[in-house]
UniProtKB/Swiss-Prot annotation:
Keywords: Cytoplasm, Methyltransferase, S-adenosyl-L-methionine, Transferase, tRNA processing. PROSITE patterns: N6_MTASE. It is found in: Cytoplasm. It comes from Yersinia pestis. The keyword Cell membrane does not apply. This is tRNA1(Val) (adenine(37)-N6)-methyltransferase. Belongs to the methyltransferase superfamily. tRNA (adenine-N(6)-)-methyltransferase family. One of its GO terms (molecular function) is tRNA (adenine-N6)-methyltransferase activity.
């Protein structure tokens, strides 16, 4: 007899519309400007959670990454998600309430600058799938602008907020388009951050690099460089990507 809610969902996932069904939870995203996508899944599956005790997701959107980290981390780990856009924050809260980890995840509908100034806790793991489009050409949808464009949260401001909120030996992890990841790492270095891990990502062998996963720290140390192809040459998911997503995607 299955008594654990997470295990029950894993064995019998409920397929629903308006979102994305994972093995142990469902993410509704019909009220969010940015939908569940590969970038968020990559970050949530990859970030180092082994030594984390308190986690912050900046710009948490639907709550996807916070939920993935909750599934991967120890039961005592507490997770805060900060989201500026009201509809997304409300949907993230609903997703959390329906998940097996409702007591561990707390969603704050707030500007991250105010949160960084007033929040009493520091975090040993901070994650973000940040905006990356320049604000020269805006969307017609204000919520989508907030999610996609750096006008609401520049990368410089993001790094400053993370510095205020991170513990002395904490890790700050982001996912970005590859060229912007290079620029983000350069900017971080100017502000006293050190790159501790960099994963260069391409869709398949021989294709251009298109995404980057970065782990930053305020402490100097060895930098680990890795590569990941999401698919093999014939188009099927690569074994490395399957290993990352196997605890989350159905049929893997």
């Amino acid at each position: 007899m299955v008594t654990n809610v997470g295990e029950q969902l894993k064995k019998q996932p409920v397929l629903r519309g308006g979102g994305f069904t994972f093995k142990q939870f469902f993410v509704a995203h019909d009220r969010c400007a940015m939908k569940v996508g590969t970038d968020g899944v990559l970050l949530g599956a990859w970030v180092p959670v082994l030594h984390a005790r308190r986690v912050l997701d900046i710009g948490c959107g639907s709550g996807l990454i916070a939920l993935m980290i909750a599934q991967r981390s120890l039961p005592q780990v507490q997770i805060d998600g900060v989201e500026l856009e009201p509809a997304a924050a409300q949907q993230a809260s609903s997703n959390v309430e329906l998940s097996p980890w409702a007591e561990r995840i707390h969603i704050h509908q707030q500007d991250i600058h105010q949160f960084a100034e007033n929040h009493p806790h520091q975090y040993d793991l901070i994650v973000s799938n940040p905006p990356y489009f320049a604000p020269a050409i805006a969307c017609r949808d204000e919520a989508r602008d907030t999610a996609r464009y750096t006008g609401s949260l520049t990368h410089d401001a993001l790094l400053n907020c993370a510095e205020k909120l991170i513990t002395e030996d904490g890790m700050f992890c982001v996912v970005l388009p590859h060229e912007l990841g290079i620029e983000f790492a350069r900017l971080a270095g100017q502000q006293g951050w050190f790159v501790r891990c960099q994963v260069d990502i391409r869709d398949r062998p021989g294709k251009p690099l298109h995404r980057m996963l970065l782990t930053l720290s305020r402490q100097a140390g060895e930098t680990v460089y890795q590569h990941l192809a999401l698919r093999q040459s014939e188009g099927v998911y690569s074994p490395e990507f399957c290993q990352l997503i196997s605890d989350f995607y159905l049929n893997y």
